[in-house]
Amino acid sequence: IEESGTSKGSFYHYFEGKDALLGSLAYMMDEKYEELEPTISEDADCYEVLLYLNRELLTMIEESINVELLTRLYSTQLTTHGERPLLDHGRTYYKLLKKIISRGREKKELRTDMSVSEMVRYYAMCERALLYEWCLRKGEYSLSEEAERKFPMMIGSLK
């Protein structure tokens, strides 16, 4: 509550508790994907689109989400018995990934021996790995630069 800069009354008016606030970060990430989706050409190489989405999302996270808040989001997701927004496949994040990966398979740009849902899960896992490591290291390096170097290797197996 103190970190949010609001009174207890205002905080609990908008959020049921700390978990709800932290969960809202996942939907902030969805807003970024909603902003990016119209910029993606139907003709674009789907692997390159996946790299683009990752680069843009992680740049936004690095520039606008406090690493301690992100760390709390991840720790809450590990211990909560309630909703887990990071795994909610109804989110824009998962829907857009599914759409891009499906198109990539149809165009033979991505492998076809894995299911779309398995590939989406793998992509999300790789992205979380980058974010989790950045949180573990308390943001001591540029997340976007690290992703630029490592993410192509991580998801290269989807081709």
Language-model features: locations:
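All-alpha amphipathic helical-bundle segments outside canonical DNA-binding/catalytic cores
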Residues: E48, P85-G90, E106-Y122, S142-E145
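Generic hydrophobic, amphipathic alpha-helix propensity
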Residues: L25-M29, Y33, L97
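Residue-level signature of the cytosolic catalytic core of signaling kinases
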Residues: E42-C46, E62, L78, T112, ...
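Short secondary-structure transition hinges
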Residues: L58-K98, E109
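C-terminal peripheral helix-coil segments that are non-catalytic and often amphipathic
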Residues: L51-Y52, E56-T59, K95, K99-K107, ...
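Hydrophobic alpha-helical connector segments
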Residues: S24, M28, P38-S64, V116-Y123
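Helix-turn-helix
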Residues: I1-A20, S24
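A short, mixed-charge helix-start or loop-turn motif at secondary-structure junctions
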Residues: F15, T39, T79-E83, E109-T112, ...
